[in-house]
């Protein structure tokens, strides 16, 4: 059975300082970084020993690709025949040479543009470098009021073949977006409404806990990042007996890496083959 794993280790540092993010300009101690690297190496070793097909998305609390151990893990995992996809969420601030050693048939990047931290021109140059190398990727932004024009400018500057997604600004008051703004944003990302006003989740079918799992640095397995109940451990194999169909226990799920795994919503079809990296099937 194919498993999709969302890995989030101990890393909690970022080189950017976005004012809405709790991890802005935070720093990990050398000891914390060493432990994170050790944990990640253990996870890669586990994946190397598997025979079942796997897909992996790294969802760090911060920026992973500025750390060599994440770049090396991406390269190593991309070489495994059992890996369908390895992807990571990134601000795309690092150089590209590490990609030379990767198998680009299996690697993808989920890229976020932060206008307060980097110029549009610089970010677009990095996107062009990805296209030149043939790296599969998506591009997106947080849809803050201050960035409405920038969102449209970025979309206009990107080729139609580059998918662009949007996350609703959070936290926000109920009337944060006008109907006209929602229409503008939905023209950029037709799925924006699911992030803005997700349908109720409690009791809804979900692939998490069955074929999609969350893994932390200790190897503790949970069904997703938003349900804290452990299902066992990755490394002793105890999680395997807990894999089964489950409905969502939460009243609301407003994050793509959660609700995209609901089969009653359009994402499994619309993003077939690209759910983890947020690339639609038509891209």
Which residues fall in each region the model found?
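N-terminal pre-triad scaffold of radical SAM enzymes
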Residues: 1-24, 55-59, 211-219
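Short, surface-exposed loop/strand segments
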Residues: 20-23, 34-45
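Core AdoMet radical
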Residues: 5, 25-37, 52-67, 77-96, ...
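Short Fe-S-cluster ligation motifs
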Residues: 42-61, 65, 255, 283
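Generic structural signal for well-ordered alpha-helices
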Residues: 41-44, 71-75, 99, 123-128, ...
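Short, cysteine/histidine-rich loop/knuckle motifs that typically chelate Zn2+
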Residues: 20, 208, 250
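Radical SAM enzyme [4Fe-4S]-AdoMet core and its adjacent flexible, acidic
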Residues: 30-31, 107-222, 226, 232
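Flexible mid-to-C-terminal extensions adjoining Fe-S/redox cofactors in radical SAM and related proteins
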Residues: 1, 11, 24, 28, ...
């Amino acid at each position: 059975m194919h498993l999709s794993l969302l890995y989030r280790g101990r890393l909690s540092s970022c080189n950017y300082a976005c004012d809405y993010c709790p991890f802005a300009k935070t720093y990990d101690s050398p000891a914390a970084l060493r432990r994170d690297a050790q944990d990640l190496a253990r996870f890669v070793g586990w994946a190397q020993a598997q025979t079942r097909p796997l897909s992996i998305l790294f969802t760090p609390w911060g920026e992973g690709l500025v750390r060599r151990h994440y770049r090396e893990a991406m390269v190593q995992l991309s070489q495994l025949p059992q890996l369908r996809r390895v992807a990571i969420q990134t601000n795309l601030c690092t150089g590209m040479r590490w990609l030379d050693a990767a198998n680009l048939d299996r690697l993808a990047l989920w890229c976020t543009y932060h206008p307060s931290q980097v110029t549009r021109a610089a970010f677009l140059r990095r996107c062009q470098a990805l296209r030149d190398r043939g790296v599969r990727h998506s591009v997106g932004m947080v849809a803050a009021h201050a960035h409405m024009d920038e969102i449209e400018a970025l979309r206009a500057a990107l080729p139609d073949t580059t998918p662009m997604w949007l996350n609703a600004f959070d936290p926000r008051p109920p009337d944060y977006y006008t109907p006209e703004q929602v229409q503008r944003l939905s023209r950029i990302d037709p799925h924006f409404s699911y992030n803005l006003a997700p349908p109720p989740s409690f009791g809804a079918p979900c692939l998490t806990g069955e074929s999609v799992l969350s893994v932390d640095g200790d190897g503790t397995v949970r069904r997703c990042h938003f349900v804290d109940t452990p299902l066992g451990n990755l490394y002793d194999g105890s999680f395997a007996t807990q894999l089964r169909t489950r409905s969502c226990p939460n009243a609301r799920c407003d994050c793509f890496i959660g609700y995209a795994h609901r089969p009653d919503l359009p994402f499994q079809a619309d993003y077939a083959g690209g759910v983890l990296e947020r690339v639609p099937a038509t891209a």
